[in-house]
């Protein structure tokens, strides 16, 4: 409970920094889960550079992009009624999610040294499955998020749920 209060104080004092660092930390945690529980690499075979890449992506891409998107979405559709939440979720999942995944997957590929041709082939192979899997999880989460959660907590709530999603994304993005 004290940790949560400290997080709230830090979030109130430095909202953008805390949101970005939260995204980076939880992206890293998702990669650790992917490597250790899904891929069963063990500590000796753990790819620390890959985890650092995911932390960097969380801080430099996911946190700023998703956090910025929530601000834009809240300005575009102000309000917290059920109808407002539904509109936000539909825009988020119909517009933002496909674009986000279409940027995230090749960004990871580029950071992993894939050639443009290999990256394009990987995107064509992985994108449809990643988007379909996205739709199994995120519409319900986002509907609740937009209806129940204040704007300054949305990225943190999503990133907590996203630990599992990040594990999947890390596995998908690093699978050759």
From Swiss-Prot:
Keyword entries, A-Z: Charcot-Marie-Tooth disease, Disease variant, Membrane, Mitochondrion, Mitochondrion inner membrane, Neurodegeneration, Neuropathy, Primary mitochondrial disease, Transmembrane, Transmembrane helix
InterPro entries the record matches: Mpv17_PMP22
Impact upon substituting residue 95 to D: In MTDPS6; uncertain significance
Membrane topology: Multi-pass membrane protein
One Gene Ontology term from the biological process aspect of the record: cellular response to reactive oxygen species
Consequence of substituting residue 36 to P: In MTDPS6; uncertain significance
Membrane-spanning residues: 18-38, 53-73, 94-114, 131-151
UniProt-recorded Gene Ontology molecular function terms: channel activity
Predominant location category: mitochondrion
Tissue expression as described in the entry: Ubiquitous. Expressed in pancreas, kidney, muscle, liver, lung, placenta, brain and heart.
Pfam families: Mpv17_PMP22 (PF04117)
NADP in keyword set: no
Subcellular location: Mitochondrion inner membrane
Coiled-coil regions listed in the entry: none
Disease with which this protein is associated in UniProt: Mitochondrial DNA depletion syndrome 6: A disease due to mitochondrial dysfunction. It is characterized by infantile onset of progressive liver failure, often leading to death in the first year of life, peripheral neuropathy, corneal scarring, acral ulceration and osteomyelitis leading to autoamputation, cerebral leukoencephalopathy, failure to thrive, and recurrent metabolic acidosis with intercurrent infections. Charcot-Marie-Tooth disease, axonal, type 2EE: A recessive axonal form of Charcot-Marie-Tooth disease, a disorder of the peripheral nervous system, characterized by progressive weakness and atrophy, initially of the peroneal muscles and later of the distal muscles of the arms. Charcot-Marie-Tooth disease is classified in two main groups on the basis of electrophysiologic properties and histopathology: primary peripheral demyelinating neuropathies (designated CMT1 when they are dominantly inherited) and primary peripheral axonal neuropathies (CMT2).
Similarity comment: family membership: Belongs to the peroxisomal membrane protein PXMP2/4 family.
Cited function: Non-selective channel that modulates the membrane potential under normal conditions and oxidative stress, and is involved in mitochondrial homeostasis. Involved in mitochondrial deoxynucleoside triphosphates (dNTP) pool homeostasis and mitochondrial DNA (mtDNA) maintenance. May be involved in the regulation of reactive oxygen species metabolism and the control of oxidative phosphorylation.
Protein name in the entry: Mitochondrial inner membrane protein Mpv17
């Amino acid at each position: 409970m004290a940790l949560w209060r400290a997080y709230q104080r830090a979030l109130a004092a430095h909202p953008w920094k805390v949101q970005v660092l939260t995204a980076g930390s939880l992206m890293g945690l998702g990669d650790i889960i992917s490597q250790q529980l899904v891929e069963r690499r063990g500590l000796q075979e753990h790819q620390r550079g890959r985890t650092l890449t995911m932390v960097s992506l969380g801080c430099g891409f996911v946190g700023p992009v998703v956090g910025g998107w929530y601000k834009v979405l809240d300005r575009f559709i102000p309000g917290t009624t059920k109808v407002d939440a539904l509109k936000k979720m539909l825009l988020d999942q119909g517009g933002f999610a496909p674009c986000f995944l279409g940027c995230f997957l090749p960004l990871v590929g580029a950071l992993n040294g894939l050639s443009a041709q290999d990256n394009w082939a990987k995107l064509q192979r992985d994108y449809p499955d990643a988007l379909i899997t996205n739709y199994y999880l995120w519409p319900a989460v986002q509907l609740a998020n937009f209806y129940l959660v204040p704007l300054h907590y949305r990225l943190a709530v999503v990133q907590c749920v996203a630990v599992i999603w990040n594990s999947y994304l890390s596995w998908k993005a690093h699978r050759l």
